[in-house]
């Protein structure tokens, strides 16, 4: 609550401000001349039960009103504004208001910040503070020019707000575009990485394909060599077959010739048996010798046929050599006989 001394100081401060206003607001130091008194009043209020925020709000209103009156005079107002004082509030209302202000912790900081901003932007908050005081003479004396200026200012403010909103939208779009570009760059880097890996894989595959082609060429050459060897072996087998056929013909002819000789010898021996009583043993030895040679020749022929058959199935050097050896042995037997 207000003490009598504090109330008197507050009214003295208001009287001094009113006197400054009555002088037309031409003395810019009228407010500065009372700074010491305000500071003393503020220090005295801080030691009392009065809320200092409420008192500071009341004190800050005074220079705003003074600046409003100065502005109205400078805009070709010939009539000076006068300040109307309201009735001093009662103790109960002040106590109630003080209690409400103390209970609003968040509201106090917001109100303080708001009044500080209003001190910095006096021109934008003059109408709000002028409504708290009754200045009918100032508001009623607005000219058409001031209204036009006010409308122009409002239009400019609206245009500025629209431009600000447009810029905000542009900034948001730019931010979205920036994010999209960042995401696109990330995807591009990922694609480049994938392409590099695929290029490496393609190069590796090409190297492997080249090695496979070289191996295939080697195998093709080996196959051609085997085909040539097989063709050569086939030719050798054909020659051996021809020789075998020729030899078989010769052997057949020789066997027929031997059988013919054997038949003639048998007949001659039979005739001689009738005439000569003792040539039987010699003929028996000749027959035995002929049968032994025939058995050797038959065995050599069968061995040669088997060697030729083995050479046909597996035409290698060993089988061909065995067939040639069997043939030579058979020829030697035939020629020796």
Swiss-Prot record:
GO MF, any single term: RNA binding
Major subcellular site: cytoplasm
Subunit structure: Interacts with KN-1. Binds to tobacco mosaic virus movement protein (TMV-MP) at microtubules.
One GO CC term, this protein: cytoplasm
Keyword S-adenosyl-L-methionine: no
Biased composition (Polar residues): 120-142
GO annotation (BP), single: regulation of cytoskeleton organization
Keywords, sorted A to Z: Coiled coil, Cytoplasm, Cytoskeleton, Host-virus interaction, Plant defense, RNA-binding
Region (Disordered): 80-147
Reported tissue expression: Constitutively expressed in leaves.
Annotated localization: Cytoplasm, Cytoskeleton
Protein name: Protein MICROTUBULE BINDING PROTEIN 2C
Compositionally biased tracts (Basic and acidic residues): 89-103
Functional note: Prevents homeodomain proteins (e.g. STM) association to plasmodesmata and, consequently, cell-to-cell transport. Binds to RNA. Alters KN1 RNA-binding capacity. Regulates cytoskeleton (e.g. actin) organization that determinates cell shape. Interferes with cell-to-cell transport of tobacco mosaic virus movement protein (TMV-MP) by mediating its accumulation at microtubules, thus interfering with cell-to-cell virus movement.
Family named by the database record: Belongs to the microtubule binding protein 2C family.
Coiled-coil boundaries: 143-194, 223-250, 294-314
